[in-house]
A protein has these predicted regions:
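Long, contiguous, secondary-structure-rich segments that constitute the structural scaffold
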Residues: 3-27, 54, 63, 70, ...
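Extended boundary segments
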Residues: 28-65
């Protein structure tokens, strides 16, 4: 088992924190994120790093049924865009209370690669709960990856927050677990 490149916790199963053979894509990506085991000057909130303190919240991305893939096709269809017209971030009631965020507030998600961040609407939910790992409480947020800069509805591109790395064997991107911060916009 390896933890994601950006993990809030220490890997207790293996002495190797992250995969030693993660894949990086283009030159731009190499400048923005890399494997701290093999390169200097990485911009990633790896466990125990200074960046990890600035981005304490675990983030995941997911789909909604109203949009397909990145939304390139479905963001042009009025009946679908009416159902999900805005980029949103799902936030637990506990984290919302801690941050002073209410349902419908515009919030900014930031990461080690995107300190300007992306904006989305807060969706306060009971579906997410804080969890305790190794004796410490962690929060998690979730956001979709269907929005972009074209279409009847547009919105922040969530993948602008995530690392440009993936599994070396399958090349599957590591968009499902990374660290962010969330604040009112």
């Amino acid at each position: 088992h390896y933890e994601p490149l950006e993990s809030a916790v220490k890997n207790l199963i293996s002495s190797q924190q992250i995969s030693p053979v993660i894949a990086r894509w283009d030159e731009k990506a190499r400048e923005k994120t890399c494997n701290p085991l093999i390169a200097e000057g990485c911009i990633a909130a790896t466990f125990g790093s200074e960046e990890a303190k600035d981005f304490p919240i675990i983030c995941t991305t997911y789909r909604v049924v109203e949009h397909w893939q990145t939304g390139q096709m479905t963001r042009w269809l009025p009946w679908l865009t009416e159902m999900v017209p805005h980029q949103f971030v799902e936030i637990s009631e506990e984290l919302a209370r801690e941050k002073g965020i209410t349902f419908g507030d515009k919030v900014r998600l930031t990461s080690a690669r995107n300190i300007e961040g992306v904006e989305a609407y807060a969706m306060i939910t009971k579906r997410l709960k804080p969890f305790v790992i190794q004796g410490k409480t962690y929060h998690m947020v979730g956001t979709t990856w269907h929005f972009g800069y074209k279409g009847l509805v547009t919105g922040a591109i969530s993948n602008d927050l995530s690392p440009y790395i993936g599994d070396a064997n399958t090349m599957i991107p590591e968009y499902k677990a990374f660290l962010v911060n969330v604040e009112k916009a």
